[in-house]
UniProtKB/Swiss-Prot annotation:
Its cofactor is FAD. It comes from Leptospira borgpetersenii serovar Hardjo-bovis (strain L550). This is UDP-N-acetylenolpyruvoylglucosamine reductase. It is found in: Cytoplasm. NCBIfam families: murB, PRK13905.1.
């Protein structure tokens, strides 16, 4: 277990941030920043508003030897019950904006909320991104995981990704970035920070776009736990196909293992969609992790298939 940050480290960090005029908050409950509504108190959350402030913040972290993690929309994340051995970086300001460029191109900041952002873009009469209006979280997180559903993936639309790596800002096309099903190279690079993207869409018929938005929203609501505290799909589909071409889904394997509705503390494997774990009470990260490990073990024992987590862990989780 990592040691907590010292009071001197925290006090010095706050003084440095104040003198640099970089926004931050103290003693932040991370559960309120998570769709799971799980997570403890972080000593400092730093909220840089532009690229220069991000670079300066990282310089401060490295100079002071302060461990840090970046947090986005918190929608596909399980946050530690005790996030007190690091500080959190959370982009703000210009990173929360998107703008139309020309010819169907949009520049989208990494801290934009995917659901309203891509709904607004679609309602401007541009088609191709309707599926993203059903995915919660922030655009930066969607980039990192190559988020997708209903046959579409974010990288199908991306023209360029702007990101920070090793204190340098890069702009790369999808062909220059390793990516695949719910995967990009950024997943394994904890020090890389997505700053924004440019996407290209086609003009479409607004009435058809509105219908598409509604159909996808209704489809999502009918197949997933509604108004429940969760982090979305817990496991990736294993990409295994039957002889008839039907894809085996993670939820089917979990159901086959007899785990639908299983409860640990305040967490439950959803009776409605068993690839979801929901917070039905005062669930802890430890409760959720117990169910995650249970699913991994039981599915392997039952089917011989090893599932891979889709949700990310944020901090130490026993």
């Amino acid at each position: 277990m990592s040691l907590t940050l010292s009071e001197l480290q925290i006090r010095t960090l706050k003084q440095t941030l104040e003198s640099s005029k970089i926004p931050f908050k103290s003693e932040v409950r991370l559960d309120i920043l998570s769709s799971f509504k799980i997570g403890g108190i972080c000593p400092v959350v730093v909220e840089p508003e532009n690229s220069n402030q991000v670079l300066e913040t990282l310089f401060i972290f490295y100079k002071s030897e302060i461990p840090w993690k970046i947090l986005g929309g918190g929608s596909n994340l399980l946050i530690s019950d005790h996030p007190d051995n690091f500080v959190t970086l959370r982009l703000s300001g210009k990173f929360k904006e998107f703008e139309y460029l020309e010819g169907g191109k949009f520049r989208i900041g990494s801290a934009t909320n995917t659901t309203p952002t891509f709904r607004q873009i679609s309602q401007l009469g541009y088609t191709g991104a309707e599926f993203l209006s059903t995915i919660p979280g922030w655009t930066g997180g969607a980039v990192i995981q190559n988020a997708g559903c209903y046959g579409g993936e974010l990288f199908d639309l991306i023209q360029t990704v702007e990101f920070l790596r090793n204190n340098e800002i890069f702009v790369r096309s999808p062909s220059e970035i390793k990516h695949g099903y719910r995967f990009t190279e950024f997943l394994n690079e904890k020090d890389s920070i997505i700053l924004g993207i440019e996407i290209l869409l086609k003009e479409g018929n607004l009435e058809e776009i509105q219908t598409s938005l509604k159909d996808k929203r209704d489809r999502r609501n009918s197949s997933q736990p509604e108004n429940k505290k969760s982090a979305g799909s817990v496991f990736k589909n294993p990409k295994i196909f039957l002889e008839n071409g039907k894809e085996i889904k993670a939820w089917e394997l979990i159901d086959q293992a007899g785990l639908r509705g299983q409860i640990k503390g305040g967490a439950q494997i959803s009776p409605e969609h068993c690839n979801f774990i929901v917070n039905v009470g005062a669930a802890t990260a430890a409760d959720v992790n117990y169910l995650v490990e249970l699913i991994l073990d039981k599915v392997f024992q039952t089917t011989g298939i090893r599932l891979n987590r889709e949700i990310e862990y944020f901090g130490d989780i026993p």
